[in-house]
């Protein structure tokens, strides 16, 4: 019961009454009209009319008491139901709206509209307006609501701090009572005294009670709370328990005639406060002086300055409650009163020793603990004020630790995970790892879909969705690990394309895995990584690691660009349709040299460099639209080792692979095309120069490593095609590995010396 208002009321209001007061106080008020007409709670119908005239009706007129005021009824659940009233006809007629919503300004405005309808006898408009609001779902904060042409409002935000002049209650309270009496009343409320506030204006009286009680936030007055006391309940002032009661000045003489002991009385009309206690001196002097100086500033008079000044005082007094929160494995989070009090100064310690026994503080702590242990958590302006003001005596990270515990499912759930049996823990890790894989797959699909929308899709091509997985470096051998670490401390690429570092990620996990314990030490929370996730990652066809071979080719392309003018990486034929592509071989000499390299690169004949689609179009094979596949660093390293070992073990014959040669009259079906991989082709061939050993595929032999002649086009090895097709047409089944071998040889030549002379070319031909 940390708050007294109902969180989710069913309706905007429950009842509207028109009550008539008789001339004699001995006669009960009479209900003239009600809405809805079928309202059947007789107890409410009998009690509400008596609260509509909380003054001496025989002595006071409407001009003396004002128009608007509010009373409060408490239901069986200790929740407050507000009665918003407006006096008319000289104080003899009262309109009352009963609601669980503390919308003071909204209902005061609605009462004025209803009074106008009654004065003009517009009963149809009156019923239509009430019916529209009664059937309207409870709107959220700051939502405009239109009831009729002349009636509309914006729902207030009751969770925020009250502001001046928007809050009528706080405005009237701040204007009617000076700063010193506000501080004395505040201190008396913190000590839970018996408090009476009196005034001749009902509107000012009820505003002072509601305004003073609101300044206790985030705590709430937990005892008897009657903003305005009707004549038949004056004996409540003799109750031995704490109370906060408002009494009209016409009835205060009757109250003083009763035996009152230890009662604090605030007279708003004379701005005087009578108290047998000196509660203000028991508060820490630094807190009181800071609050007093803040309230006296002119800038505090508007906005939320007054409410925030009291909020800061509350944070200074009670903000260290976070340091007294205790957590033991297997038990809910608890609050240690001894720890809350013992480390304070003498004045603060004396006050807190009294404060821990206050009902408003106990309800506040119980509400916080209930939210923490239920896993809901809390984040309000009070917690923000504690953090910003540094009123928590412990580590600044302590509150984040509790929030982290809540996010992990509450203290009880966290205990269940850490104290679970190995079987339960393994199941938890398995579910967690597969949930991560599923999330990564969804992100990769969304990313691939965005790429398709951005670059378009090629008709007739098979689309694929790469599955990005985390790479397990522990299972690699030492040689692969060295090759993958060619670029030291290479940041990995995340699923959304951003770069991150493993060390930073580990630090974040370590920082997030701290929770506080009873003795103030910090223990680590458990972050489980499933062993099953590693197996799932190995089976993934593609990986999100960097393409090292592609970067090597990029480097070679950059070096070769200095030797001559280069054309764009992709020709315009890349965007041509499949029917427009011509694959007729040319009969010119393609031997690369220093003289004709620039001509080859800048040649207008794009048939030589249209490697983006020619292979798939030539054989009718459907390849992925992306020119560059992503492979894992482990698989790529393995391919490079295979290429190096096979190239060293067995020299390649002239029919297989040779260096660049000069061909005078190239035959259409034999010979070797000696055209090097120019920089234009390196961009498109980069994604194709990758090898993937699929299950069931025969080991590659050096005899199969051949490059196509000038009469045939280089084809890309498709791993999902059956091996039976290789025996039918050898000219069409040249694998991707052939291109890799040729690229490696030619890349070495480019890297050693791009100035290819005539002597080296004749030596290679021999």
UniProtKB/Swiss-Prot annotation:
At which positions is motif FXDXF motif?
A: 378-382
Q: Where is the composition biased (Acidic residues)?
A: 499-509
Q: Matching Gene3D superfamilies, A to Z?
A: 3.30.450.200, 3.40.50.11500, 6.10.140.1000
Effect of gene disruption? Mice are developmentally normal and fertile but accumulate more splenic and lymph node CD4(+) and CD8(+) effector/memory T-cells with age. TH2 cells display increased TCR-mediated responses, due to delayed surface TCR down-modulation and recycling, and increased production of cytokines. Mice have increased antigen-induced allergic responses.
Listed GO MF terms: guanyl-nucleotide exchange factor activity; small GTPase binding
User: Under the cellular component aspect of Gene Ontology, which terms does the record hold?
Assistant: clathrin-coated vesicle; cytosol; nuclear speck
Q: Which residues carry this modification: Phosphoserine?
A: 516-517, 530, 533, 632-633
Which residues are in the uDENN domain?
14-143
Q: In which tissues is it expressed?
A: Expressed in a subset of dendritic cells (DCs).
Q: Where is this motif: Clathrin box?
A: 547-556
Location(s) in or outside the cell: Cytoplasm, Cytosol; Cytoplasmic vesicle, Clathrin-coated vesicle
Mod. after translation = Phosphorylated on serine and/or threonine, possibly regulating the guanine nucleotide exchange factor (GEF) activity.
Major subcellular location class: cytoplasm
Give the sites modified to Phosphotyrosine: 500
- Please provide the record's keywords in A-Z order: Cytoplasm, Cytoplasmic vesicle, Guanine-nucleotide releasing factor, Phosphoprotein, Protein transport, Transport
UniProt domain dDENN: residue ranges: 298-375
Q: Where in the sequence does UniProt note compositional bias of the Basic residues kind?
A: 480-492
InterPro entries recorded: cDENN_dom, dDENN_dom, DENN_C, DENND1A/B/C, Tripartite_DENN, uDENN_dom
Q: Which residues form the cDENN domain?
A: 160-296
Positions with biased composition (Basic and acidic residues):
722-732
Q: In Gene Ontology terms, what is a biological process of this protein?
A: endocytic recycling
**What is the purpose of this protein?**
Guanine nucleotide exchange factor (GEF) for RAB35 that acts as a regulator of T-cell receptor (TCR) internalization in TH2 cells. Acts by promoting the exchange of GDP to GTP, converting inactive GDP-bound RAB35 into its active GTP-bound form. Plays a role in clathrin-mediated endocytosis. Controls cytokine production in TH2 lymphocytes by controlling the rate of TCR internalization and routing to endosomes: acts by mediating clathrin-mediated endocytosis of TCR via its interaction with the adapter protein complex 2 (AP-2) and GEF activity.
- What is written about domains in the entry's comments? The FXDXF motif mediates interaction the AP-2 complex.
- Summary of subunit composition and partner proteins: Interacts with RAB35. Interacts with clathrin heavy chain/CLTC. Interacts with components of the adapter protein complex 2 (AP-2) AP2A2 and AP2B1. Interacts with CD3E.
| Listed name of the protein | DENN domain-containing protein 1B
Ranked from the top, the taxonomy reads: Eukaryota, Metazoa, Chordata, Craniata, Vertebrata
